[in-house]
């Protein structure tokens, strides 16, 4: 499987190698439980084949709000706190509402990485021409700490006025831009800063100034407005190396870039804190409309697991065995409906997961 050429998060935002071979698991909401289930089936196949003991701890039973969404209650908070204190990475199912933003703020998960590296075995599922897909290898880096998503919000004047604050402190911008510059220096040495000077003049100016001031290592720096960046990502992603952006822009860019992957169900990401906390999650939403139908694509969740294994547990051997199994099954034409090509065999979530697990089990024990 072709992954982004330098998928790992640079220090200080790398989770590093945990001393304990253990992961925490949060089921998420919507399709989360079903795709996490497949990730666990595949992981257990990898554990059984390799003989590597990995302990799995699940978060407490979900407690729903009245909108059928996860709430960051005390039980969840204690689970995350315990995992992060012990340097245990978390594999997270998709979640929506305010949950993910509150989680990132509470535990200072300031930076989100989303690799965009199209899978060659499903090129026929993409809207883009094959030559553009082959050359595409982009790392999206998004701030999680400020902007509209973390600003004050509410109602005024008896509900006739709604407001949402977009605020950035220079220190917040410096943190994420420093990480992006370091990441670019480890890759092809190119960084695109995405803002919107006309619509958000002061915030855009702060991001531009910060990038120019911090770029002391000679990274090739460029600037692009968010609307154009969305178009370019959706039509010619091969032109980019690393992209960094404010919170909301990064959210939109991540979903737009999924065009190159063939489906949002193939997308994955990771959130890191400066202290080493790591939450690996799909880069797509909870898809409540697909919940319980056994049709969701589990591959993004499996790739999320691979990233966790490789970069937090330092088990690249297990990650590679799962990636090879995914490639084998997709190459055989078995796909969920969202990535089906003209000659594909459309299978269910559980069927695809079972086939990938079987492919893992059929491999020789991985060599570390």
Please give the residue ranges for each predicted region.
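Extreme N-terminal starter segment of soluble prokaryotic enzymes
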Residues: 18-24
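Glycine-rich phosphate/diphosphate-binding loop of Rossmann-like nucleotide-binding domains
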Residues: 24-46, 158-227, 239
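Buried hydrophobic positions in well-ordered alpha/beta secondary-structure cores of metabolic enzymes
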Residues: 29-32, 88, 141, 180, ...
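N-terminal beta-loop-helix "entrance" segment that forms/cooperates
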Residues: 51-77, 233
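N-terminal glycine-rich phosphate/adenylate-binding segment common to multiple enzyme folds
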Residues: 67-163, 248
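Glycine-rich phosphate/nucleotide-binding loop
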Residues: 117, 234-334
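Short acidic loop-to-helix transition motifs that present clustered carboxylates
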Residues: 121-123, 224-231
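Glycine-rich phosphate/pyrophosphate-binding loop and the adjoining helix
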Residues: 151-156, 161-192, 197-201, 321, ...
């Amino acid at each position: 499987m072709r992954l982004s050429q330098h998928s790992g998060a640079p220090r200080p935002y790398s989770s590093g190698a945990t001393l304990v071979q253990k992961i925490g698991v949060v089921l998420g909401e919507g399709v989360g439980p079903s795709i996490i289930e497949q990730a666990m089936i595949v992981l257990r196949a990898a554990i059984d084949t390799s003989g590597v003991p990995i302990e799995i701890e699940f978060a407490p039973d979900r407690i729903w709000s009245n909108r059928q969404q996860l709430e960051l209650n005390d039980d969840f908070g204690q689970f995350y706190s315990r995992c992060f204190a012990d340097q245990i990475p978390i594999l997270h199912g998709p979640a929506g509402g305010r949950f993910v933003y509150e989680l990132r703020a509470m535990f200072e998960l300031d930076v989100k990485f989303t690799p965009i590296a199209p899978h060659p075995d499903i090129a026929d599922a993409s809207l883009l021409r094959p030559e553009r897909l082959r050359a595409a290898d982009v790392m999206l880096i998004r701030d999680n700490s400020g902007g509209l998503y973390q600003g004050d919000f509410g109602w005024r004047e008896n509900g006739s006025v709604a407001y949402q604050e977009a605020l950035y402190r220079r220190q917040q911008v410096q943190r994420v831009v420093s990480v992006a510059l370091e990441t670019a220096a480890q890759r092809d040495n190119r960084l695109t800063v995405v803002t919107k000077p006309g619509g958000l003049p002061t915030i855009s100016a702060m991001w531009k100034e910060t990038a120019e001031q911090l770029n002391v290592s000679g990274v090739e720096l460029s600037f692009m407005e968010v609307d154009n960046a969305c178009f370019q990502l959706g039509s010619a992603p091969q032109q980019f190396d690393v992209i960094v952006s404010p919170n909301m822009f990064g959210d939109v860019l991540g979903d737009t870039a999924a065009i190159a992957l063939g489906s949002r169900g193939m997308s994955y990401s990771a959130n890191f804190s400066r202290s080493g906390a790591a939450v690996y999650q799909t880069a797509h939403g909870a898809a409540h409309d697909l919940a319980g139908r056994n049709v969701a694509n589990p591959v993004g969740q499996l790739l999320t697991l691979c990233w966790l294994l490789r970069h937090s547990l330092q088990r690249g051997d297990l990650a590679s065995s799962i990636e090879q199994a995914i490639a084998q099954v997709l190459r055989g034409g078995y796909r969920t409906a969202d990535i089906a090509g003209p000659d594909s065999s459309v299978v269910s979530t559980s069927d695809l997961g079972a086939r990938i697990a079987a492919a893992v089990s059929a491999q020789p024990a991985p060599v570390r």
